């Protein structure tokens, strides 16, 4: 079909599925600096060597062996976004885990290195070269900064491309029930990345500019569940898909 599934195992944040099983690896006694009502119980404490060893073991289960679940042609997404504890440990973790997984697979991650910055721990070349990054927020990952660092970029900026089914547009044009497809058609350009100085163009066709994507986040769950079905989600996907296709697929097929 010409489509490749990119599996994501999200670490070290958004990792409730792991901290429930291994609570000893959880960040304990800390709350989000953004929301004091949110304890960081979904964060793996990557300042502990045993945590990093467990994360490697998890990825090894999928990427290594005689018949790995994720073969060498599979791009593996490691998440790596919205970590809100011990930025030095996080950046050291990125410097260790990305080259480790690169031994078997292409690595993709969500942008977070602008926000998660201790201003002393540099990200190494091995954790940048040929690594793919979804740009989703200028605050978490300044697009121009990530380009200059050398990451391969996928423009997934929330300002144009984030929808939350049955959402209420927490910000103008983003996080609502549907994308603003008129705005996407009129003004979205995949090679214009969002940075602290506004939208900045990187060269069209640049090897570092892989394209663009939009995201459907089914955040309204549990007590906020709206009763939407998979068919409802598909309709929302199909509403936006041709407009992103128009913007990202050139006549050359690139």
Question: Where do the PLM segments sit?
Answer:
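Short glycine/threonine-rich loop-to-helix capping motif typified by GTGT followed
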Residues: 82-93, 119-131
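Flexible, acidic glycine-rich loops studded with aromatic residues
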Residues: 120-131, 136-254
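Loop/turn elements at helix/coil->beta-strand transitions in domains of secreted/extracellular proteins
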Residues: 2-4, 71-74, 102-107, 128-130, ...
């Amino acid at each position: 079909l010409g489509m490749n599934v990119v599996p994501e195992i999200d670490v070290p944040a958004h990792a409730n599925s792991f901290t429930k099983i291994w609570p000893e690896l959880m960040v304990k006694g800390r709350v989000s600096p953004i929301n004091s009502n949110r304890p960081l119980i979904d964060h793996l404490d990557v300042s502990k060597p045993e945590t990093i060893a467990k994360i490697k073991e998890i990825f090894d289960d999928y990427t290594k062996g005689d018949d790995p679940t994720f073969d060498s042609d599979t791009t593996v997404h490691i998440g790596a976004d919205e970590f809100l504890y011990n930025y030095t440990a996080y950046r050291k973790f990125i410097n260790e885990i990305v080259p480790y997984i690169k031994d078997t697979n292409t690595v993709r991650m969500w942008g977070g290195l602008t926000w998660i910055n201790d201003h002393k721990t540099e990200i190494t070349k091995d954790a940048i070269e040929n690594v793919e990054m979804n740009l989703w927020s200028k605050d978490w990952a300044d697009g121009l900064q990530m380009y200059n660092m050398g990451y391969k970029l996928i423009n997934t900026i929330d300002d144009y491309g984030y929808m939350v089914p049955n959402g209420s547009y927490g910000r103008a044009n983003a996080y609502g029930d549907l994308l603003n497809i008129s705005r996407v058609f009129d003004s979205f350009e995949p090679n214009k990345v969002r940075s602290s100085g506004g939208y900045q163009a990187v060269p069209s066709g640049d090897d570092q500019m892989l394209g663009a994507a939009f995201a459907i986040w089914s955040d309204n769950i549990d007590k906020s569940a709206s009763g939407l079905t998979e068919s409802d989600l598909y309709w929302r996907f199909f509403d936006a898909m041709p407009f992103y296709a128009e913007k990202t697929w050139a006549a050359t097929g690139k």
